[in-house]
Amino acid sequence: MIGRLRGVVIEKQPPEVLLEVGGVGYEVQMPMSCFYDLPEIGKEATIHTHFVVREDAQLLYGFNHKQERALFRELIKTNGVGPKLALAILSGMTATQFVLSVEREEISSLVKLPGVGKKTAERLVVEMKDRLKGWVSHDLFSPAEITLPARESALRAPDSSEEAASALVALGYKPQQASQIVSKVAADGMSVEDIIREALRSLV
């Protein structure tokens, strides 16, 4: 099993990053709450990974901290929640925000996440509340995770909006919904990551 990768960021296409380790390029899917903190292309990064083997694919999911990976693993233990939905959930909320929503039984917040209906939200609370008890109070997550970090904005390229919309679709949002929200929040001076961040904030 691949548990951690340390290498150079070769390509960033939300929510996927290509990391070169020892001459081998690893495609790693990351929650956007983790993706925002990745270094720039050409810089070195360390990613904690969860390896999934399916009949048709072998997939790597990556996280900045072991605790985020631990939460991802707790999520996929929940009935009806697979890796793709878990990725979408942790893209719409930081790990800390999700744990607090479950602890406080905030169904109204959870149903705003892509792929999460009322029944799924209720199941998340019922099945995970006891398992997540004390996670935040015991400082299992870093303070930086409580709010999304500000990033320096690069000049928005003409296809930034298209890339941002594609990333939202990959996370489970419907194409029309993704395009509409991107059009609403996108502005000059915003990078792809900036657009995605603002889109997710407005959706949740």
UniProtKB/Swiss-Prot annotation:
Region (Domain I): 1-64
One GO-annotated biological process of the protein: DNA repair
Top-level taxonomic group: Bacteria
GO cellular component terms attached to this protein's record: cytoplasm; Holliday junction helicase complex; Holliday junction resolvase complex
Keyword Transmembrane helix recorded: no
Region (Flexible linker): 144-155
Subcellular location: Cytoplasm
Ranges where the record places region Domain III: 156-204
Listed InterPro entries: DNA_helicase_Holl-junc_RuvA_I, Hlx-hairpin-Hlx_DNA-bd_motif, NA-bd_OB-fold, RuvA, RuvA_2-like, RuvA_C, RuvA_C_sf
GO molecular function: ATP binding; four-way junction DNA binding; four-way junction helicase activity
Domain notes: Has three domains with a flexible linker between the domains II and III and assumes an 'L' shape. Domain III is highly mobile and contacts RuvB.
Assembly information from the UniProt record: Homotetramer. Forms an RuvA(8)-RuvB(12)-Holliday junction (HJ) complex. HJ DNA is sandwiched between 2 RuvA tetramers; dsDNA enters through RuvA and exits via RuvB. An RuvB hexamer assembles on each DNA strand where it exits the tetramer. Each RuvB hexamer is contacted by two RuvA subunits (via domain III) on 2 adjacent RuvB subunits; this complex drives branch migration. In the full resolvosome a probable DNA-RuvA(4)-RuvB(12)-RuvC(2) complex forms which resolves the HJ.
Function: The RuvA-RuvB-RuvC complex processes Holliday junction (HJ) DNA during genetic recombination and DNA repair, while the RuvA-RuvB complex plays an important role in the rescue of blocked DNA replication forks via replication fork reversal (RFR). RuvA specifically binds to HJ cruciform DNA, conferring on it an open structure. The RuvB hexamer acts as an ATP-dependent pump, pulling dsDNA into and through the RuvAB complex. HJ branch migration allows RuvC to scan DNA until it finds its consensus sequence, where it cleaves and resolves the cruciform DNA.
NCBIfam families given in the database record: ruvA (TIGR00084)
Protein name listed in UniProt: Holliday junction branch migration complex subunit RuvA
Species assigned in the record: Aeromonas hydrophila subsp. hydrophila (strain ATCC 7966 / DSM 30187 / BCRC 13018 / CCUG 14551 / JCM 1027 / KCTC 2358 / NCIMB 9240 / NCTC 8049)
Source organism phylogeny: Bacteria, Pseudomonadati, Pseudomonadota, Gammaproteobacteria, Aeromonadales
